[in-house]
C-alpha cells in the first residue's frame, strides 16, 4: 500500500487500550484503502491523526476517563463512511439529482451521518458518540452540542487543514517553479 501508516500504530498505549477494538477491527483497517486528503493520506491515517489530536485536547481539558474514551472512539470513527467518494459509482448516484438536492447529497454533507450509523451498527457507540460523528462537519452539518462533539470537530478541522496544506503545497511549489522559471 502507498499509504503512510504501516504495521503497528504508533498510538499512545492509553489510546490503544481505550480503542483497541476499533483499531484492530477489519472494517476499520479497510480505511487504509481509501485515499483522503492527498495522494499519500488514507482515511485510516486521517482518522488516527484526528484521534491523537482529540486525545491531546481531552487531556489538556482534564476530561474524565469515560469522556476521554468517548472522544477517542468518536474521533477514530468520524469518517467511518466506508466508500470511496471519488469513485464513479458515487458520481453516478449524484447525477440523478440536481440543484439543492444534489448539493445536500454530496459527500461533505452526508458522510457524518453515514459514518455515525455505520459506527453504531459495528461498534455499538453511545448516542453522544454518534452525535459527535454526525455533527463533525459543522457548519455543513448541525452545530455540535457537547464537549465531545466540539473536540472531535476542532481536531478534525486542525488535522484536515494540515493534511490539505501538505497536499496542496506540492502543487503550489510546482506552480511557482513553472511561473518563476528563468529560462
Give short role names for the model-derived ranges.
Residues 56, 60-62, 93, 161-183:
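Extended, folded domain segments that form the structural surfaces/walls around functional sites
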Residues 46, 78, 111-112, 136-137:
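Histidine-centered active-site/metal-ligand motif
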Amino acid at each position: 500500500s502507498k499509504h503512510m501508516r504501516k504495521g503497528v500504530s504508533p498510538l499512545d498505549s492509553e489510546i490503544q487500550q481505550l480503542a483497541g477494538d476499533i483499531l484492530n477491527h477489519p472494517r476499520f483497517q479497510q480505511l487504509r484503502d481509501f485515499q483522503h486528503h492527498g495522494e499519500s493520506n488514507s482515511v485510516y491515517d486521517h482518522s488516527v491523526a484526528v484521534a491523537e489530536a482529540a486525545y491531546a485536547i481531552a487531556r489538556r481539558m482534564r476530561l474524565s476517563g469515560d469522556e476521554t474514551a468517548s472522544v477517542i472512539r468518536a474521533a477514530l470513527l468520524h469518517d467511518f463512511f466506508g466508500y470511496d467518494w471519488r469513485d464513479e459509482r458515487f458520481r453516478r448516484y449524484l447525477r440523478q439529482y440536481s440543484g439543492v438536492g444534489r448539493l445536500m447529497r454530496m459527500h461533505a454533507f452526508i458522510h457524518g451521518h453515514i459514518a455515525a450509523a455505520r459506527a453504531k451498527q459495528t461498534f455499538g457507540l453511545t448516542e453522544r458518540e454518534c452525535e459527535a460523528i454526525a455533527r463533525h462537519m459543522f457548519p455543513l452539518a448541525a452545530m455540535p452540542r457537547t464537549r465531545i462533539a466540539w473536540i472531535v470537530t476542532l481536531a478534525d478541522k486542525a488535522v484536515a487543514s494540515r493534511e490539505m496544506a501538505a497536499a496542496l503545497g506540492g502543487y503550489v511549489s510546482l506552480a511557482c517553479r513553472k511561473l518563476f522559471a528563468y529560462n
